[in-house]
Amino acid sequence: MKQELILASSSASRQMLMRNAGLTFSAIPADIDERALDEQLERDGASPEEVALELARAKALAVSALHPEALVLGCDQTMALGTRVYHKPKNMAEAATHLLSLSGKVHRLNSAAVLVHNGKVVWQTVSSAELAVRTLSAEFVSRHLQRVGEKALSSVGAYQLEREGIQLFTSIEGDYFTILGLPLLPLLSKLRDMDVIDG
């Protein structure tokens, strides 16, 4: 790597995706109040895609202010069912409510990535995927959440598609990496264009 790359996140799945892609990077979580910014954007009428992009930008800019020489990657993901925007569940009861509300319906995940260098946005993208959840009974959801435990609280949809959560779905349209929260292929293309990784 010719330039230091920092992921402005503590997300284990994003770190895994980047490591598996052969990227060398540091992970420094951004110190921002995501929920307050998210709520303000929603009050201002921002779309779920715009919310993801603005949160990713805020994270990257916050870390770039402390490490201006580095190329900082900020990421965020939003989930929406129609006009309802979801947030990470606070507890297992809320996780169950999330899953039951998705039952038999198609929801949308929006994953944003923003690169910032020296306090300036140099690249940004948002990609989306649509996921169809099979019809779920309350009893199944309860058993499922008992099996997966607290991991359900780490995802906006209360599921981890890369694990047992895959059993919740009947169909998926969109990029796998987008679903995991990182538009990896466009990111790798941009890093090659910028001569940050070997192209």
UniProtKB/Swiss-Prot annotation:
One GO CC term, this protein: cytoplasm
Active site as annotated: 76
Catalytic activity as recorded in UniProt: a ribonucleoside 5'-triphosphate + H2O = a ribonucleoside 5'-phosphate + diphosphate + H(+); a 2'-deoxyribonucleoside 5'-triphosphate + H2O = a 2'-deoxyribonucleoside 5'-phosphate + diphosphate + H(+)
Predominant place of localization: cytoplasm
Cofactor: a divalent metal cation
Gene Ontology biological-process annotations: nucleotide metabolic process
CDD domains: Maf
Keywords: Cytoplasm, Hydrolase, Nucleotide metabolism
Protein's UniProt keywords contain Hydrolase: yes
Enzyme Commission number(s): 3.6.1.9
Top-level class of the enzyme under EC nomenclature: hydrolase
Keyword Hydrolase: yes
InterPro entries cross-referenced by the UniProt entry: ITPase-like_fam, Maf-like
Cellular localization per UniProt: Cytoplasm
Top-level taxonomic group: Bacteria
GO molecular function, one term: nucleoside triphosphate diphosphatase activity
Pfam family, one: Maf
NCBIfam families linked: PRK02478.1
Function: Nucleoside triphosphate pyrophosphatase. May have a dual role in cell division arrest and in preventing the incorporation of modified nucleotides into cellular nucleic acids.
Similarity field: Belongs to the Maf family.
Descriptive protein name: Nucleoside triphosphate pyrophosphatase
